[in-house]
């Protein structure tokens, strides 16, 4: 079990809230970004962004780049470089942020992430079969 801030986890919601159904999750210790699609499947990608790269990797909106609506840093680089990801996820309404506290519990079929932010706790179940669920 991983507990606390020693394993930073970032989150970005995509689409229109408050009932978001697509996310990007960044696991700092793994340098992986998990993309949670609206069809309840997920894929992971290596986070290759670093401080020497632009904060905004692309700007398909033809407006001055800002976040929101554009994802930035590692989320933005992935959003810009993976084919069809922009169409599948859309843009963001809120700036990416780190979970204030995280608990990650691995189990035989996958893992459960608890993300504590402000007065909200969200639980994400990432299954080894490539499916995910937001537990309420």
Indicate residue ranges for each PLM-predicted region.
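Extended, compositionally biased repeat/scaffold regions that form elongated interaction surfaces
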Residues: 1-136
